Amino acid sequence: HFVRTPKPSRTKGPKSAKSGTSSGSANPDTDAVSEPSDSDVSIQHPIYDYCQEELDSVELEFRIEPPSKSILDNFEHYTAAVVIVDRWYKHEGHTVAYSLSFMPIELVGRLHIDLNSTDALLEFLEHECYQPDHHCSRSITYSTAGNFSAKNYKLSSHDSFLLTQENVCDEDDEILVVSKHYIPAELFELKLAV
């Protein structure tokens, strides 16, 4: 159990100058919108990109488990185990968004991510995996599962969420992280420059 204050330059919200698990439960997500990444554009974590609320802390928990079939299908290659990371994003003590991420255990070893340091794990998931030579694919759908998925906290009194499903890939197109990010609909904002 870990709580960290995010880097100030990465926070998002009205005051800022910067613009589910595979448990087998039914997925009520519909109306997908795809957002392909452009290699010329810097990418950042969707919670910081799309949540209008200014964030002041992140709580993290993780576990290591054997992968389910759906997780293996997402990675498109075999992995002996996955690191499953839950993150709750807070504003003034209230949880306003939630992310669930899956990483192959081999990646943790290859990149020397110290799992004894939740700070190092959080830094990788929030910032390092979005480095300029990496890219991602994102699909945004409406969901009613945000409060259920966030387990420990209620994100919103409404059951309306925008779910961003994301695969972050390295320069060789290997999937590094598969994530689901839940933001209450009333706090979600997507800006596109075309």
Residue map of PLM features:
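A short glycine-rich, His/Asp/Glu-containing loop-to-beta-strand
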Residues: 55-61, 85, 91-101, 183
